[in-house]
């Protein structure tokens, strides 16, 4: 996935990429082999401290997508992994446009469970009643501000499917990381986690769970007609 993203964003030595909402650097560290200069923007000091220790090659700055702390035309590319749906798009899109150079590209990345996988579908069936809302990356409502914006053209898209082996307890921990589940009273949370564990069965052997990574690459509209159609392909 990262190799295809790097090609789509034309990341290489001599280019600069700004990683927004960088968190602890999960995507940031994967960009290092491209040879590009990496500027990681993260508002939380605790997250930045982890990022700086994990990815010393990156320049970590305090900031947000709505107030990016770099000059105009700094970046050849801007990335955001698992983050764009949290941005205030009305403010973030002009900022991203501002920091991109002519020809610059915006790469948005999301990981999600592959619901074509029967195991993942069963997990979703169990947890969906407990969600008060669905993340925008699942409903795709994050697309609307970009569709309406004159600042970026239609995206090029690709998806990559991958597997991760999880034990019963690792699966339960993964589900517990969902804020809506973690916030449940213990009397409701514990039985749910027991049902989640039962998806795998009684054994301790890890089971493969399928995931997918969806990538969307947008080009600055001043360099690409806004009515140009993007492409979509899967890997």
Describe each region flagged by the PLM.
Residues 24-26, 144-235:
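Conserved Class I S-adenosyl-L-methionine
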Residues 80-81, 89:
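A short beta-strand submotif of the Rossmann-like class I SAM-dependent methyltransferase core
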Residues 66-77:
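A short acidic, Gly/Pro-enriched loop at the edge of an enzyme's catalytic core
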Residues 87-95:
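A short, conserved alpha-helix within the catalytic core of class I
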Residues 16-20, 24-67:
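Class I SAM-dependent methyltransferase SAM/SAH-binding core
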Residues 1-4, 34-35, 68, 86-87, ...:
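Tryptophan-centric aromatic hotspots in well-structured domains and transmembrane helices
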Residues 1-15:
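Conserved alpha-helix/loop element of class I SAM-dependent methyltransferases that forms part
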Residues 94-164:
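Conserved catalytic/acceptor-binding region of the Class I
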């Amino acid at each position: 996935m990262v190799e295809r993203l790097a090609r789509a964003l034309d990341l290489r030595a001599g280019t600069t990429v700004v990683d927004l909402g960088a968190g602890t650097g999960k995507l940031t560290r994967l960009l290092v082999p491209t040879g590009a200069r990496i500027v990681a923007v993260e508002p939380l000091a605790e997250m930045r401290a982890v990022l700086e220790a994990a990815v010393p090659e990156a320049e970590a700055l305090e900031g947000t997508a709505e107030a990016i702390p770099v000059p105009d035309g700094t970046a050849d590319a801007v990335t955001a992994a698992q983050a764009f749906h949290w941005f205030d798009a009305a403010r973030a899109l002009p900022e991203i446009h501002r920091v991109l150079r002519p020809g610059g590209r915006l790469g948005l990345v999301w990981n999600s469970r592959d619901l074509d996988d029967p195991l993942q579908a069963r997990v979703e069936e169990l947890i969906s009643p407990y969600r008060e809302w669905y993340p925008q990356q699942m409903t795709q409502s994050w697309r609307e501000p970009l569709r309406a914006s004159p600042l970026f053209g239609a995206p090029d898209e690709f998806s990559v499917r991958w597997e991760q082996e999880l034990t019963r307890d690792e699966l339960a921990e993964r589900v517990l990381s969902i804020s809506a589940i973690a916030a449940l009273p213990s009397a409701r949370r514990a039985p749910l986690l027991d049902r989640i564990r039962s998806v795998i069965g009684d054994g301790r052997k890890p089971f493969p769970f399928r995931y997918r990574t969806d990538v969307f690459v947008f080009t600055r509209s001043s360099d690409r007609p806004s009515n140009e159609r993007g492409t979509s392909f899967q890997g």
